[in-house]
Structures are given as C-alpha cells and as structure tokens.
Amino acid sequence: MKKLFTSESVGRGHPDKICDQISDAILDAYLTWDPHSKVAVETMVSGNNVFIAGEVKSKVTVDVIEIAKNVLRNIGYYSNNTSFITDIKSQSENIAMGVNLQDSDDLGAGDQGFMFGYATNETSQYMPLGITLCNKIVSRAGMLIKNQEFKDAKEDMKTQVTLDYSDPQNVKVDTIIFSCHHNEKYNETKFKNYIKTQILKPVLDEFNLELPERILINPTGKFVIGGPFSDTGLTGRKIIVDTYGGSARHGGGAFSGKDATKLDRSGAYMARWIAKNLVAANIADKIEVQIAYSIGVAKPVSVMVNTFGENKVPEDVVLDAILNNFELTPKGIIKSLNLNKPIYQKSSVYGHFGREDFQFTWESLDKVEAIREFVISKGFNI
C-alpha cells in the first residue's frame, strides 16, 4: 500500500488570498506612519463588492478603499464597477488596557490562544516538501503571468501535490492538480502543455523529482469564471496554505490583517523561528513547538516541544534551550523579530514560512550557535 500525503497552495488571485493581501496592505499602511498601531482588519470580496471591517488604534488614518483598489488593480480583478463598504472601529478599551504598554516589559498578549511552529530538514528551507512544491508552483505561475509569458492565464489558481512516501529515501510525486483561471478564447492544448513544461517541470527539477503520470489540469474542463466572481473570499481562510500544508498542527488563528500584538501571528512566527533554528542546530530532524498565552499577560502560560522521537538530546534540555535563548513575551517577540515594520503584505501570498524571495526575520538562523553552545554546556554533543 502506498503511503501518500497531500498539500495544497493557491495563487494571489484566489478570492481568500485577495482578502489576505488587502488586509495586510492596510496593516502595512498603518505601520508605515505609526509603528505602534494596533490593527485587526478583515476583508470580504464577492463579485464587484468589497467589505472591509475591523478594529484599529493608531495615531494616523489611512485610505483603506484606495489601498484595496490598488491591491485589486495589481492582481487584475478591479473594475470601475467595484463598490466598497467599510466599518473600521476603535480598538476595544478592555483589550487596549492589556496591550498598550508599548514601552513596558508587561506588554500583554492581545488575546488568549496557542500557536505552533514547525521545521524539518526535508528541504533546504527547513519546510515540508509538499507545501514547498505547492508554493513554488503557484509562485512561478504568478511570476510568468506578471511577465506576460503565461498566455491567457489569470491569477486565480490552485495546486495540489500528492507525495508518495512509501520509500522515505526515494520520495516521489504521485499526483499534481493544477487549476488556473483563463480567458474564454484560449488554446487548451498549448495552455496545458505550457503548465507542464514551463511551470511544473522546472519546480520539480529543482528537487530532482520526476513529473508524475497523473497530472490533472483544470479537471472540470474550463475555468473561465474566476476570482471573486466565482467564489466569495474572506481574510484568514487559508491558514494551512499559509503555514505547513498539513504537515504540522495549527492553533487555528489566522495571520493577515493583524499587528504583532496579536499572538496568533507573532507567536506563530516566533514558534517557527525557534523550530527552524533547533533543526538547523541538529537537535532533531523535525521539531514542533507550541506556545500558549493569556490575554493581558506577558509570559506564555505554556511552552511545549515535540521532537517526534528523533531528538539527539533530551526534550527537557531542548525546552531549556528555548527558554534560555528566546524572548517569549509579546514585547520580546516584537523586538527580536522587528515586527513593527510594514512587511506583511509580502507574506500574505505563497506562504509565510520557508520563503527565499524575502528575508523575513523569523526565517533567520541567527540562534543556531547559541543553541549548540547551550546544549554542549549541558554535556551533550550534537
């Protein structure tokens, strides 16, 4: 029996991803002028209608409608008939009491919750292979559309990759599904051949993988109606695409539209940074980290590390290495990862983790040596 595992990703024209990009573009606009802005913005798109709502506390105001228009124009789904409804309110005073101590070590979490971070040495990005392939496929397709090389294609797309792990030393691609919005008048044969030869094959070649026999391209036949005209989109509905493609657990909180006092986002970034540095330090082949918080409280209520039985040092030593080398309070996370900068729209498509096109702070490996030194000081060689 085959041992199969599947992951997926979506392009920047997918309705949910349109919303993520609008929400993060609005967040970036606030942070550009007031780095201490507290922002929680949600977007919904449906046909020619765009709804933007949320809570904000900032010294500045921004033109959220113009920001949304620019995002839609850039993707290719804006028209003069697009209408906008906005409802941006002030942040709740009850929440603000716990998170407005921006110069204090007592800066509390903006909400309760738990977050997971994960890393594996399966790829050079310290990411699972499946989600890495999916993100690279849709990213490459988007780049080719932008360069006007992928003819008749539009930005709403999805891909799904099934890997065969029957032989862990010889992982193979079992199935690829690729659905892409296209013009009504197009050459189907050329379109599908281009996808296979110019999108799928170059990505698989990068990982020394062969194209599978089963490749399903637009398996329903046509994909002429796309973007927000085919499906309603919402911010935060692609949380598995945003993270590890199902290879690791998820705390349930979405990222986009939230400033760094929302631990759903910054806590997940910190957990990823921890896990990646631990794996890079050769602590284990794969590691999952969980951090949990209470609203208004600075220190986490729990920290957990799971090495899946592949650890080279005891897990209690690994946990001590985390607690001694990483600042886990909201203020510590924001300062360590420099999260008050307008960097978030870049993260809103093609995955928040394992990215090579941007130097996100949570992807840095600047804690590897400190972790190694700590473990060695406890009497373990790695």
UniProtKB/Swiss-Prot annotation:
Residues 91-101 are annotated as: Flexible loop. K(+) binds at residue 42. Keywords: ATP-binding, Cytoplasm, Magnesium, Metal-binding, Nucleotide-binding, One-carbon metabolism, Potassium, Transferase. InterPro entries: ADOMET_SYNTHASE_CS, S-AdoMet_synt_C, S-AdoMet_synt_central, S-AdoMet_synt_N, S-AdoMet_synthetase, S-AdoMet_synthetase_sfam. It is found in: Cytoplasm. GO terms for molecular function: ATP binding; magnesium ion binding; methionine adenosyltransferase activity. GO terms for biological process: one-carbon metabolic process; S-adenosylmethionine biosynthetic process. L-methionine binds at residues 55, 91, 231, 262. SUPFAM superfamilies: S-adenosylmethionine synthetase. Mg(2+) binds at residue 16. CDD domains: S-AdoMet_synt. Gene3D superfamilies: 3.30.300.10. Its EC number is 2.5.1.6. GO terms for cellular component: cytoplasm. Binds 2 divalent ions per subunit. It catalyses: L-methionine + ATP + H2O = S-adenosyl-L-methionine + phosphate + diphosphate. Homotetramer; dimer of dimers. Catalyzes the formation of S-adenosylmethionine (AdoMet) from methionine and ATP. The overall synthetic reaction is composed of two sequential steps, AdoMet formation and the subsequent tripolyphosphate hydrolysis which occurs prior to release of AdoMet from the enzyme. Belongs to the AdoMet synthase family. PANTHER family: S-ADENOSYLMETHIONINE SYNTHETASE. This is S-adenosylmethionine synthase.
